[in-house]
Design a protein with these regions (language model features):
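Catalytic-loop motifs flanking and including active-site residues across diverse enzymes
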Residues: 2, 33, 157-158
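Glycine-rich phosphate/diphosphate-binding loop of Rossmann-like nucleotide-binding domains
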Residues: 11-85
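Catalytic cores of large soluble enzymes that bind and process phosphate-bearing ligands
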Residues: 2, 102, 106, 153
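A glycine-rich, Thr/Ser-enriched phosphate-binding loop motif common to dinucleotide/cofactor-binding enzymes
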Residues: 1-9
Length: 173
């Protein structure tokens, strides 16, 4: 349901998904959120870019029309929407990247990195946020952030999904 609410939020804020440029940054390799978003966004006509450390961003995504980047600037500079994924601390033990500090330095969205971002780009995150890792507080709480709207929309979208899977309901109060 995360991809449904992410796409709902994008559509609510940007209008049509068709032609929208969406960057997904982080651990693409292990993320169901990334894969679901990629599938849904491509089906709806968006242009998708994925970015992150090379071991966490499989080149195989290029085969389905996704642009693959291994530096933050290239991933986000043309994006209408930037969706940052949570880095799971257990990935540190698997040596996908040297340290949390190293990840944050090269792939964390902070005030300095925001210089490369379009002024009207939306900043999204499925949560929970590791502040200071995927993005800093100034960005998470800044004017481009729609993270709280994602949370709000998540409740409505998930209620709608439950309503639909529950089958025929005779009375809605």
């Amino acid at each position: 349901t995360q991809a449904l609410l992410d796409i709902f939020t994008m559509r609510e804020k940007k209008g049509s998904i068709k032609g929208l440029k969406v960057a997904i940054v982080g651990d693409i390799l292990h993320s169901r959120v990334a894969r679901s978003n990629i599938w849904g966004l491509l089906k709806l006509g968006a242009e998708v870019t994925v970015g992150g450390p090379a071991p966490l961003v499989p080149k195989e995504f290029e085969a389905v029309g996704v642009k693959v980047c291994h530096n933050l600037k290239d991933a986000v500079q043309d994006a209408d929407v930037i969706n940052l994924l949570r880095i799971q601390h257990e990935r540190l033990n698997a040596a996908y990247f040297p340290s949390i500090g190293e990840y944050s330095k090269f792939f964390g969205l902070n005030q300095e990195a925001m210089k490369f971002v379009r002024p009207d780009a939306l900043i999204m995150h499925p949560g929970p946020i590791n502040r200071g890792v995927e993005l800093d507080s100034a960005v998470a709480d800044g004017p481009n952030s729609v993270i709280l709207e994602q949370v709000t929309n998540g409740l409505a979208v998930r209620m709608a999904v439950l309503f639909l899977v529950a089958g025929q309901v005779k009375h809605v109060y």
